[in-house]
Amino acid sequence: MASEGRLYEVSFDADGCGATKAATAAVAEMIDGAPVLDAALIDIDTVDAAIGGLTPAKRHAAQLATDALHRALQGVASSSLSLIPPSQSGGVATSPAADGCHAPQHRVAVAMSGGVDSAVAALLAREEGAEVVGVTVKLWTDPETDGAKACCSPEAVLGARALAHQLGIPHFTLDLEEDFRRRVVDRFIGGYTAGTTPNPCILCNGEVRLAAMIDLAERVGAERLLTGHYARIVVDGVGPLLAAAADKAKDQSYMLAALPPELLGRLGFPLTELTKPEVREIAARHGLAVARKAESQDLCFLAGQGKRGFLRRHGGLRERDGAIVDSAGRTLGRHRGHHDFTVGQRRGIGVSAPEALYVLATDATANTVTVGTRAELEKRSVRVRDVVLHRDGSAVDAVKLRYRSRALPATVSAAGKGRHPSLDVDLGEAFPGVAPGQTAVLMAGEQIVGHGTIAA
């Protein structure tokens, strides 16, 4: 039981060898009456030392006891309870800090994924004198995925916890699987079912994980949540806005575009001015094993498996014969399901032609895929739905239509700050591959002033 930041009436049910029972008993004794933050610091070595040292063959007992403790702490963290004594309650800051700086001895929470970026964010915060608390979210469990490649899998949680303890900081896990399934995965499946190409990472960042971690940051008495994203926060006369990071090759502001402005004041990005090679060098200099860890290229719930298999298993989208047609409706070939294709796709279409063909559109109802030339693919205007503008539409001078694409010169139809059912975005140059379902990020220079979902 947790109350006023401490653990009480602690007990463990342990089956197995004597070492396992001794390890769990030691954990129960250590944490009964202890502050929750102290319990979150306990790792395998702590348990090992508490029972006088285990032989290598018995060290698994300390692992089992530690895992049981942190599963229990996950339940506490995933509740609405405050995890600190009332005297320490301060809450997160409401003023933005682009670099995540803070006064010495201030407490910050750091979102830790188990990768090098978040590890260095935590390291930099600690070196600046902050009391750091690590937070990891568990979003998806699927035996068919490669947990080692997923950022929010049970395996990633263990890796993040080990990194936090290596840095000497407490660690908590938030279980958001149910919310993630409902608000992200189900909409991902629904998008492909309807013939669009959704962007689940923007949904997750904007609606699920960061808000939950900011809430936990407040409950552990942290002034703000720091993350390892490459992005910047700037402040104008109205308030905070997202902007591009110094490392344009790694800039992740597009993926954060759906964050409400009120959350930006509670976030910090310590890597704003750093490049990826610099981050890896910092990690290597401090002996972190993740310094050379490869980056995941998959969506967290697709790691190690293909999109087709995932949609079949979780969305019931199975192979269904359909026609590949040109813009005049002539049949050029066959396919096995419209959901295997996205607008702008060139490879894997399965149709031979004198010049390269691209996917122009998919029709879920007719189960057809329309292909054509690059010239047919190009667009000079885009209809965007469910638009949120943080500034007046007249401020928009560019738009980004895909994560890895550059921002294009653009203007929007007259619109004031706020929400709009739809807006037309006129492009200053033709863009090939405007995919319905993707996010259109509206920009003023390098600042993000709005976003919406591409409709056509």
Predicted segments with their positions:
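Alpha-helical scaffold segments in soluble metabolic enzymes
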Residues: 26-29, 64-71, 212, 278-285, ...
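Conserved short-loop catalytic and cofactor-binding motifs
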Residues: 11, 15, 53, 148, ...
